Amino acid sequence: MSMYTTAQLLAANEQKFKFDPLFLRLFFRESYPFTTEKVYLSQIPGLVNMALYVSPIVSGEVIRSRGGSTSEFTPGYVKPKHEVNPQMTLRRLPDEDPQNLADPAYRRRRIIMQNMRDEELAIAQVEEMQAVSAVLKGKYTMTGEAFDPVEVDMGRSEENNITQSGGTEWSKRDKSTYDPTDDIEAYALNASGVVNIIVFDPKGWALFRSFKAVKEKLDTRRGSNSELETAVKDLGKAVSYKGMYGDVAIVVYSGQYVENGVKKNFLPDNTMVLGNTQARGLRTYGCIQDADAQREGINASARYPKNWVTTGDPAREFTMIQSAPLMLLADPDEFVSVQLA
Protein backbone atom coordinates (compact mmCIF):
# COMPACT_ATOMS: atom_id res chain seq x y z
CA MET A 1 0.00 0.00 0.00
CA SER A 2 1.42 3.39 -0.99
CA MET A 3 1.12 6.46 1.21
CA TYR A 4 0.77 8.54 -1.97
CA THR A 5 -2.04 8.44 -4.52
CA THR A 6 -1.21 8.55 -8.23
CA ALA A 7 -2.70 12.06 -8.40
CA GLN A 8 -0.39 13.21 -5.60
CA LEU A 9 2.63 11.67 -7.30
CA LEU A 10 1.73 13.27 -10.63
CA ALA A 11 1.28 16.66 -8.95
CA ALA A 12 4.56 16.43 -7.06
CA ASN A 13 6.34 15.21 -10.16
CA GLU A 14 5.02 18.07 -12.27
CA GLN A 15 5.50 20.87 -9.77
CA LYS A 16 8.85 20.02 -8.26
CA PHE A 17 10.72 17.99 -10.82
CA LYS A 18 9.99 19.68 -14.14
CA PHE A 19 12.99 19.19 -16.39
CA ASP A 20 13.10 21.79 -19.15
CA PRO A 21 15.84 21.10 -21.72
CA LEU A 22 16.26 23.43 -24.67
CA PHE A 23 15.16 21.39 -27.68
CA LEU A 24 12.00 20.10 -26.03
CA ARG A 25 11.04 23.57 -24.85
CA LEU A 26 11.79 25.45 -28.06
CA PHE A 27 10.83 22.99 -30.76
CA PHE A 28 8.56 20.30 -29.25
CA ARG A 29 5.59 22.10 -27.75
CA GLU A 30 2.76 19.77 -28.81
CA SER A 31 1.96 16.63 -26.82
CA TYR A 32 -0.15 13.67 -27.97
CA PRO A 33 -0.60 10.76 -25.54
CA PHE A 34 -2.40 7.76 -27.04
CA THR A 35 -4.67 5.20 -25.40
CA THR A 36 -3.10 2.49 -27.56
CA GLU A 37 0.30 0.83 -27.47
CA LYS A 38 0.97 2.26 -30.91
CA VAL A 39 1.21 5.91 -31.94
CA TYR A 40 -0.99 6.60 -34.98
CA LEU A 41 0.39 9.47 -37.02
CA SER A 42 -2.87 9.82 -38.96
CA GLN A 43 -4.63 10.84 -35.73
CA ILE A 44 -2.37 13.85 -35.10
CA PRO A 45 -4.12 17.05 -36.33
CA GLY A 46 -2.59 18.55 -39.46
CA LEU A 47 -0.11 15.74 -39.99
CA VAL A 48 -1.08 14.75 -43.52
CA ASN A 49 0.45 11.59 -45.00
CA MET A 50 3.44 11.58 -42.67
CA ALA A 51 5.21 8.25 -42.36
CA LEU A 52 8.30 7.08 -40.55
CA TYR A 53 10.90 4.79 -42.03
CA VAL A 54 11.74 2.20 -39.41
CA SER A 55 14.56 -0.34 -39.49
CA PRO A 56 15.60 -2.89 -36.87
CA ILE A 57 19.11 -2.71 -35.50
CA VAL A 58 21.00 -5.94 -34.90
CA SER A 59 24.49 -5.86 -33.37
CA GLY A 60 24.77 -2.14 -34.03
CA GLU A 61 23.86 -2.39 -37.73
CA VAL A 62 20.73 -0.91 -39.28
CA ILE A 63 18.98 -3.63 -41.29
CA ARG A 64 17.47 -1.56 -44.12
CA SER A 65 16.26 -4.61 -46.03
CA ARG A 66 13.94 -5.43 -43.15
CA GLY A 67 12.78 -1.87 -42.66
CA GLY A 68 9.78 -0.15 -44.12
CA SER A 69 7.54 2.88 -44.03
CA THR A 70 4.79 3.05 -41.42
CA SER A 71 2.21 5.53 -40.17
CA GLU A 72 1.73 3.65 -36.91
CA PHE A 73 4.52 3.01 -34.49
CA THR A 74 5.21 1.29 -31.17
CA PRO A 75 7.41 3.53 -29.00
CA GLY A 76 10.03 2.08 -26.71
CA TYR A 77 8.87 1.67 -23.12
CA VAL A 78 10.97 3.13 -20.31
CA LYS A 79 10.37 2.59 -16.60
CA PRO A 80 13.20 3.61 -14.25
CA LYS A 81 12.71 2.03 -10.83
CA HIS A 82 14.19 2.38 -7.33
CA GLU A 83 13.83 0.56 -4.05
CA VAL A 84 13.11 2.51 -0.87
CA ASN A 85 15.66 0.94 1.45
CA PRO A 86 14.44 0.99 5.09
CA GLN A 87 18.06 1.26 6.26
CA MET A 88 18.30 4.66 4.58
CA THR A 89 15.52 6.04 6.76
CA LEU A 90 17.63 5.37 9.86
CA ARG A 91 20.55 7.51 8.67
CA ARG A 92 20.80 11.29 8.69
CA LEU A 93 20.14 12.81 5.28
CA PRO A 94 22.94 14.98 3.81
CA ASP A 95 21.09 18.26 4.46
CA GLU A 96 19.74 17.34 7.90
CA ASP A 97 20.68 19.48 10.88
CA PRO A 98 22.61 17.22 13.31
CA GLN A 99 21.05 19.20 16.16
CA ASN A 100 17.53 18.70 14.84
CA LEU A 101 17.31 15.21 13.37
CA ALA A 102 14.22 14.19 11.40
CA ASP A 103 12.21 11.06 12.13
CA PRO A 104 12.37 7.99 9.84
CA ALA A 105 8.89 8.66 8.42
CA TYR A 106 10.01 12.09 7.19
CA ARG A 107 13.18 10.62 5.70
CA ARG A 108 11.14 7.98 3.91
CA ARG A 109 9.00 10.65 2.28
CA ARG A 110 12.13 12.54 1.25
CA ILE A 111 13.69 9.39 -0.23
CA ILE A 112 10.53 8.59 -2.19
CA MET A 113 10.45 12.08 -3.68
CA GLN A 114 14.16 11.96 -4.51
CA ASN A 115 13.64 8.62 -6.26
CA MET A 116 10.81 10.10 -8.30
CA ARG A 117 12.96 13.07 -9.22
CA ASP A 118 15.74 10.80 -10.45
CA GLU A 119 13.27 8.68 -12.43
CA GLU A 120 11.70 11.75 -14.05
CA LEU A 121 15.15 13.06 -14.94
CA ALA A 122 16.06 9.72 -16.52
CA ILE A 123 12.98 9.82 -18.78
CA ALA A 124 13.43 13.52 -19.59
CA GLN A 125 16.96 12.80 -20.77
CA VAL A 126 15.59 10.14 -23.14
CA GLU A 127 13.06 12.64 -24.50
CA GLU A 128 15.66 15.38 -24.97
CA MET A 129 18.06 12.97 -26.66
CA GLN A 130 15.31 11.94 -29.08
CA ALA A 131 14.45 15.61 -29.71
CA VAL A 132 18.08 16.65 -30.28
CA SER A 133 18.74 13.71 -32.60
CA ALA A 134 15.54 14.41 -34.56
CA VAL A 135 16.65 18.01 -35.10
CA LEU A 136 20.31 17.18 -35.80
CA LYS A 137 19.88 14.14 -38.04
CA GLY A 138 16.19 13.69 -38.76
CA LYS A 139 16.41 10.26 -37.17
CA TYR A 140 17.41 8.41 -34.01
CA THR A 141 17.64 4.96 -32.52
CA MET A 142 14.83 4.10 -30.13
CA THR A 143 15.32 1.63 -27.29
CA GLY A 144 13.14 0.56 -24.40
CA GLU A 145 12.31 -2.07 -21.83
CA ALA A 146 12.54 -5.55 -23.45
CA PHE A 147 12.57 -3.78 -26.80
CA ASP A 148 14.88 -4.48 -29.73
CA PRO A 149 16.57 -1.23 -30.88
CA VAL A 150 14.88 0.38 -33.88
CA GLU A 151 15.95 3.33 -36.01
CA VAL A 152 13.23 5.96 -36.46
CA ASP A 153 13.85 7.89 -39.69
CA MET A 154 11.71 10.98 -40.36
CA GLY A 155 13.01 11.46 -43.90
CA ARG A 156 15.42 14.38 -43.60
CA SER A 157 16.80 15.55 -46.97
CA GLU A 158 20.51 14.82 -47.35
CA GLU A 159 21.33 18.45 -48.14
CA ASN A 160 19.99 19.50 -44.73
CA ASN A 161 22.84 17.67 -42.98
CA ILE A 162 26.02 19.54 -43.89
CA THR A 163 29.67 18.91 -43.02
CA GLN A 164 32.17 21.65 -43.80
CA SER A 165 35.00 20.28 -45.94
CA GLY A 166 37.05 20.89 -49.08
CA GLY A 167 38.21 24.36 -48.10
CA THR A 168 34.89 25.59 -46.68
CA GLU A 169 35.98 24.96 -43.10
CA TRP A 170 35.67 28.06 -40.92
CA SER A 171 38.78 27.05 -39.00
CA LYS A 172 40.81 27.65 -42.18
CA ARG A 173 39.34 31.08 -42.90
CA ASP A 174 41.04 34.38 -42.06
CA LYS A 175 39.27 35.56 -38.91
CA SER A 176 39.97 39.23 -39.58
CA THR A 177 38.69 39.38 -43.17
CA TYR A 178 36.26 36.50 -43.76
CA ASP A 179 32.52 37.02 -43.22
CA PRO A 180 30.60 33.76 -42.51
CA THR A 181 27.24 35.45 -43.16
CA ASP A 182 27.12 34.26 -46.78
CA ASP A 183 27.70 30.67 -45.63
CA ILE A 184 24.85 30.89 -43.14
CA GLU A 185 22.50 32.35 -45.74
CA ALA A 186 23.42 29.57 -48.16
CA TYR A 187 22.82 26.90 -45.51
CA ALA A 188 19.48 28.50 -44.61
CA LEU A 189 18.23 28.09 -48.18
CA ASN A 190 18.03 24.33 -47.56
CA ALA A 191 15.45 24.82 -44.80
CA SER A 192 11.82 24.35 -45.81
CA GLY A 193 10.87 27.51 -43.91
CA VAL A 194 12.35 30.73 -42.56
CA VAL A 195 15.30 30.43 -40.17
CA ASN A 196 14.96 32.64 -37.09
CA ILE A 197 17.26 30.90 -34.61
CA ILE A 198 20.72 29.32 -34.64
CA VAL A 199 21.83 27.00 -31.84
CA PHE A 200 25.54 26.38 -31.26
CA ASP A 201 27.41 24.13 -28.89
CA PRO A 202 30.10 26.06 -26.91
CA LYS A 203 32.94 25.13 -29.28
CA GLY A 204 30.92 25.95 -32.37
CA TRP A 205 30.03 29.32 -30.84
CA ALA A 206 33.68 30.04 -30.05
CA LEU A 207 34.60 29.35 -33.68
CA PHE A 208 31.75 31.52 -34.99
CA ARG A 209 32.48 34.51 -32.77
CA SER A 210 36.20 34.35 -33.59
CA PHE A 211 35.42 36.21 -36.83
CA LYS A 212 35.75 39.98 -36.67
CA ALA A 213 32.67 40.34 -38.89
CA VAL A 214 30.55 38.41 -36.39
CA LYS A 215 31.60 40.60 -33.49
CA GLU A 216 30.68 43.68 -35.51
CA LYS A 217 27.27 42.38 -36.63
CA LEU A 218 26.07 40.66 -33.46
CA ASP A 219 23.48 42.81 -31.67
CA THR A 220 23.58 42.00 -27.97
CA ARG A 221 20.98 44.58 -26.96
CA ARG A 222 17.65 43.42 -25.61
CA GLY A 223 14.46 44.39 -27.37
CA SER A 224 15.58 43.51 -30.89
CA ASN A 225 12.81 40.97 -31.39
CA SER A 226 10.32 40.59 -28.55
CA GLU A 227 8.80 37.32 -29.82
CA LEU A 228 12.17 35.61 -30.11
CA GLU A 229 13.38 36.97 -26.79
CA THR A 230 10.27 35.55 -25.13
CA ALA A 231 10.97 32.18 -26.73
CA VAL A 232 14.59 31.97 -25.59
CA LYS A 233 14.51 33.66 -22.18
CA ASP A 234 14.66 31.82 -18.84
CA LEU A 235 15.97 28.61 -20.38
CA GLY A 236 18.20 27.68 -17.45
CA LYS A 237 21.87 27.48 -16.70
CA ALA A 238 22.69 25.26 -19.70
CA VAL A 239 21.52 27.86 -22.24
CA SER A 240 22.95 31.27 -23.11
CA TYR A 241 21.26 33.84 -25.36
CA LYS A 242 24.03 35.72 -27.18
CA GLY A 243 22.02 38.24 -29.21
CA MET A 244 20.61 38.83 -32.69
CA TYR A 245 22.58 38.25 -35.88
CA GLY A 246 20.49 40.17 -38.35
CA ASP A 247 17.00 38.80 -37.74
CA VAL A 248 18.25 35.50 -36.29
CA ALA A 249 18.60 34.74 -32.57
CA ILE A 250 21.89 33.17 -31.49
CA VAL A 251 21.75 30.64 -28.64
CA VAL A 252 24.47 28.46 -27.11
CA TYR A 253 23.43 25.15 -25.55
CA SER A 254 25.68 23.23 -23.18
CA GLY A 255 23.09 20.77 -21.88
CA GLN A 256 24.32 17.40 -20.68
CA TYR A 257 23.02 13.91 -20.02
CA VAL A 258 24.47 11.08 -17.96
CA GLU A 259 25.36 7.75 -19.58
CA ASN A 260 26.89 4.99 -17.47
CA GLY A 261 27.79 7.56 -14.82
CA VAL A 262 29.58 9.85 -17.30
CA LYS A 263 28.34 13.33 -18.25
CA LYS A 264 28.10 13.92 -21.99
CA ASN A 265 26.94 16.89 -24.06
CA PHE A 266 23.70 16.61 -26.02
CA LEU A 267 25.27 18.56 -28.88
CA PRO A 268 28.51 17.27 -30.44
CA ASP A 269 31.47 19.64 -30.57
CA ASN A 270 31.38 22.24 -33.36
CA THR A 271 27.67 21.94 -34.07
CA MET A 272 25.47 24.64 -35.61
CA VAL A 273 21.72 24.13 -36.01
CA LEU A 274 19.54 26.47 -38.07
CA GLY A 275 15.83 26.34 -37.33
CA ASN A 276 12.64 28.17 -36.46
CA THR A 277 11.00 28.52 -33.06
CA GLN A 278 7.62 27.81 -34.69
CA ALA A 279 8.76 24.42 -36.03
CA ARG A 280 6.27 21.70 -35.23
CA GLY A 281 7.88 19.18 -32.93
CA LEU A 282 5.57 16.51 -31.52
CA ARG A 283 5.86 14.73 -28.19
CA THR A 284 3.92 11.52 -28.72
CA TYR A 285 3.42 8.76 -26.16
CA GLY A 286 2.09 5.23 -26.33
CA CYS A 287 -0.34 4.10 -23.64
CA ILE A 288 0.74 3.14 -20.14
CA GLN A 289 0.95 -0.66 -19.97
CA ASP A 290 0.28 -1.23 -16.30
CA ALA A 291 -2.70 -2.99 -14.67
CA ASP A 292 -2.79 -0.46 -11.82
CA ALA A 293 -2.93 2.40 -14.32
CA GLN A 294 -5.78 0.72 -16.19
CA ARG A 295 -7.74 0.22 -12.96
CA GLU A 296 -7.32 3.92 -12.25
CA GLY A 297 -8.43 4.85 -15.75
CA ILE A 298 -5.00 6.18 -16.72
CA ASN A 299 -4.13 5.00 -20.20
CA ALA A 300 -3.20 8.05 -22.29
CA SER A 301 -0.51 9.78 -20.26
CA ALA A 302 3.05 11.00 -20.74
CA ARG A 303 3.93 9.59 -17.31
CA TYR A 304 2.66 7.08 -14.79
CA PRO A 305 4.41 7.36 -11.42
CA LYS A 306 3.77 4.73 -8.78
CA ASN A 307 4.90 3.86 -5.26
CA TRP A 308 4.06 0.46 -3.81
CA VAL A 309 4.96 -2.12 -1.18
CA THR A 310 5.29 -5.85 -1.81
CA THR A 311 4.39 -8.02 1.17
CA GLY A 312 6.76 -10.68 2.38
CA ASP A 313 9.52 -11.32 4.86
CA PRO A 314 10.67 -8.65 4.69
CA ALA A 315 8.26 -6.39 2.80
CA ARG A 316 9.89 -4.20 0.15
CA GLU A 317 8.93 -0.76 -1.15
CA PHE A 318 9.56 0.62 -4.64
CA THR A 319 9.07 3.70 -6.78
CA MET A 320 8.82 3.79 -10.58
CA ILE A 321 7.76 6.12 -13.39
CA GLN A 322 6.62 4.63 -16.70
CA SER A 323 6.53 6.30 -20.12
CA ALA A 324 6.53 5.39 -23.82
CA PRO A 325 8.00 8.50 -25.50
CA LEU A 326 8.45 9.10 -29.23
CA MET A 327 9.61 12.59 -30.30
CA LEU A 328 8.77 13.45 -33.92
CA LEU A 329 9.15 16.35 -36.35
CA ALA A 330 6.23 17.06 -38.67
CA ASP A 331 8.74 18.49 -41.16
CA PRO A 332 12.35 17.44 -40.49
CA ASP A 333 13.56 19.77 -43.27
CA GLU A 334 12.65 22.84 -41.20
CA PHE A 335 16.11 22.37 -39.68
CA VAL A 336 19.59 22.45 -41.17
CA SER A 337 22.39 20.83 -39.18
CA VAL A 338 25.97 21.90 -39.88
CA GLN A 339 29.08 20.15 -38.59
CA LEU A 340 31.63 22.95 -38.41
CA ALA A 341 35.29 22.28 -39.08
Swiss-Prot record:
Keyword set includes Phosphoprotein: no
Annotated Gene3D superfamilies: capsid protein of prophage domain, putative capsid protein of prophage domain like
Localization terms from the record: Virion; Host cytoplasm
Gene Ontology CC: one annotated term: T=7 icosahedral viral capsid
Highest taxon in the source lineage: Viruses
This protein's UniProt keywords: Capsid protein, Host cytoplasm, Late protein, T=7 icosahedral capsid protein, Virion
The UniProt record lists the keyword RNA-binding: no
Function: Assembles to form an icosahedral capsid with a T=7 symmetry. The icosahedral capsid is about 60 nm in diameter and composed of 415 major capsid proteins. The assembly is primed by the interaction between capsid assembly protease and portal dodecamer, and major capsid proteins assemble cooperatively to form the procapsid with the help of capsid scaffolding protein. Major capsid protein forms hexons and pentons of the icosahedron. Viral genomic DNA is packaged into the procapsid through the portal vertex.
Family of this protein: Belongs to the lambda phage major capsid protein family.
Complex formation: Homomultimer. Interacts with FI protein.
HAMAP family: CAPSID_LAMBDA
Name of the protein described by the UniProt record: Major capsid protein
Native organism: Escherichia phage lambda
Taxonomic lineage from the root: Viruses, Duplodnaviria, Heunggongvirae, Uroviricota, Caudoviricetes
